[in-house]
Regions:
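Conserved C-terminal "switch" segment of AAA+ ATPases
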Residues: 49-55, 70-115, 134-141
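Short, well-ordered alpha-helical packing segments
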Residues: 25-29, 51, 83, 123-126, ...
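Conserved catalytic/switch belt of AAA+ P-loop NTPases
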Residues: 2, 7, 11-42, 48-61
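C-terminal helical "lid" subdomain and adjoining coupling/linker elements of P-loop NTPases
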Residues: 93, 108-160
Length: 160
């Protein structure tokens, strides 16, 4: 056996006290020990639950002894992510929507909720804005191509 196993939100194995979770942890630990030369396990998740996960079993902390903490994205980076969703969907932001989004992202980054989702937050915001845009345009009889491809400020205001 060899390769790389990536487990996102690994702490779900240790929550709830299920036998399945403990069995999965035991199996992973055994595979790591038996295949040290050619098997890598990477676990990922939010910092606090990951710390609890690593402390849930004496073998975990010693086997996962390298930690990399990825900082949250800045408002500018989040804007770039949102814009990439726009480009991928042939959409654009109106000028006032750009400024609104910049202000919203600055506020969001200063008041982050626990377990802030970064890129996923931008995907969700984009999808809600698209839904809002579709609802707004459904009330218009004659819709231009530009209107179909533009997210306006009101689409964003109701998206978060």
């Amino acid at each position: 056996m060899g390769g790389i196993l990536f487990i996102d939100e690994a702490y779900t194995f240790s929550k709830g006290g299920t036998d399945f979770g403990q069995e999965a942890i035991d199996t992973i630990l055994k595979a790591m020990e038996d295949n040290r030369e050619n098997f890598v396990v990477i676990v990922a998740g939010y910092p606090e639950p990951m710390e609890e996960f690593l402390n849930s079993n004496p073998g975990l902390k010693s086997r996962f002894n390298k930690n990399i903490l990825f900082e949250d994205y800045s408002p500018d980076e989040l804007l770039q992510i949102f814009n990439s969703f726009c480009r991928s969907n042939d959409m654009k932001l109106s000028d006032d929507a750009v400024q609104y989004l910049k202000d919203y992202l600055a506020h969001l980054c200063q008041n982050k909720p626990d377990n802030f989702a970064n890129g996923r937050e931008m995907r969700n915001l984009f999808e809600k804005a698209l839904s809002n845009q579709a609802n707004r345009l459904a009330q218009i009889v004659d819709i231009s191509d530009d209107a179909l491809n533009e997210i306006k400020i009101e689409d964003l205001e109701n998206a978060h």
